């Protein structure tokens, strides 16, 4: 299968390790195991004693009951047996496409978005239609445009973007009605779900639509990207059977240690979420103040998530801007051209506060040389 290079991941692979100020990171400030046990109040010594005595088999092939039950509680209507474990959310998205999409199927995706959501179906041979989100519309989908792209042959509609836009329950409901009219699946990458700037329940697509497919992981909301634990949740039995069948070919199980640690975090999801909501809210205030103080930069203020798409008014391509800034100051952001958004950069603002402040100061310093 021929597939386009994954622009954002190639960028991260090449430059992340040597960054002095990593404000390209999209996870909420990652936790160590020591921090996890401290946050949750679980006994580290008891856990290690019990785990170290276990034989390292494949473990529960479908994931432990504790893990799947913990994930199901993140939704209103999902049951434990409606959760399929995967290798991270990236693995989940890939798994969904390879299980459900065939050459010739129509897939409607949006842009800017995570490149998986259009490059994988395109590589499979699907007919991929792109709806471009507009800054003047706060990066929210235009329902009339979406209707014009969705045909009777549409197999799937994909929702996700890196701008921090937040779709209301009413807007999601309208998208559901469009999908239901042609029997299409809706794949919603929900890795940032509940990382909002206001205290409100964020609806999941699976609680609104019988053919909704939710993808998520332990990486962003739970600050545990090192576990590589993700999942697919759906009520659709035919889709779930396809996921499990394909899973036998490429996963088998998720690993006993990952399962055990993820189960701890999920048991205390309220504590983990409270910590991370505090971080994204306090840090976005810092980024927003920086935007106000630097007239060469502008953005649509995020309402959710951990990233912001920040535009600049310098006459310089985003790859050149970001490379020069990286080499001259050590500040590391993601070029907007990775998302086909020229003259912009994606800033991850959920890192530790000192990295964020120092990174933004480095951007200011670099901008002064242009």
Task: Please provide the spans of the model-predicted regions.
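A short helix->loop->beta-strand "cap" motif at the edges of active sites that frequently abuts
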Residues: 105, 126, 181-184, 210
């Amino acid at each position: 299968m021929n597939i386009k290079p994954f622009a954002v991941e190639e960028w991260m692979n090449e430059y992340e390790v040597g960054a002095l100020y990593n404000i390209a990171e999209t996870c909420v400030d990652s936790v160590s195991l020591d921090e996890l046990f401290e946050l949750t109040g679980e006994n580290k010594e008891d856990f290690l004693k019990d785990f170290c005595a276990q034989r390292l088999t494949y473990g529960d092939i479908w994931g432990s009951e504790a893990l799947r039950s913990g994930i199901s509680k993140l939704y209103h209507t999902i049951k434990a047996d409606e959760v399929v474990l995967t290798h991270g959310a990236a693995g989940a998205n890939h798994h969904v496409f390879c299980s459900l999409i065939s050459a010739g199927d129509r897939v409607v995706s949006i842009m800017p978005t995570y490149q998986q959501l259009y490059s994988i179906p395109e590589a499979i041979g699907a007919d991929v239609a792109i709806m471009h989100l507009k800054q003047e519309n706060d990066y929210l989908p235009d329902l009339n445009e979406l209707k014009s792209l969705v045909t009777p042959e549409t197999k799937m509609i994909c929702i996700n973007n890196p701008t921090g836009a937040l779709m209301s329950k009413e807007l999601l409901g309208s998208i559901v009605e469009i999908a239901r009219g042609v029997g299409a699946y809706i794949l919603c990458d929900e890795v940032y779900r509940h990382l909002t700037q206001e205290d409100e329940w964020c609806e999941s697509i699976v609680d609104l639509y019988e053919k909704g497919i939710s993808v998520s992981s332990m990486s962003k909301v739970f600050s545990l990207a090192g576990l590589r634990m993700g999942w697919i949740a759906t009520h659709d039995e035919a889709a779930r059977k396809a996921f499990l069948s394909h899973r036998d070919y490429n996963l088998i199980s998720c690993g006993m240690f990952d399962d055990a640690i993820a189960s701890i975090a999920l048991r205390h999801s309220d504590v983990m979420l409270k910590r991370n909501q505090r971080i994204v809210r306090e840090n976005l205030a810092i980024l927003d103040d920086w935007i106000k103080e630097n007239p060469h930069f502008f953005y649509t203020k995020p309402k959710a998530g951990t990233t912001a798409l920040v535009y600049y008014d310098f006459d310089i391509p985003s790859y050149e801007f970001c490379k020069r800034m990286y080499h001259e100051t050590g500040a590391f952001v993601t070029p907007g051209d990775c998302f086909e958004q020229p003259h912009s950069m994606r800033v991850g603002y959920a890192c530790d506060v000192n990295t964020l402040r120092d990174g933004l100061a480095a951007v200011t310093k670099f901008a002064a040389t242009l």
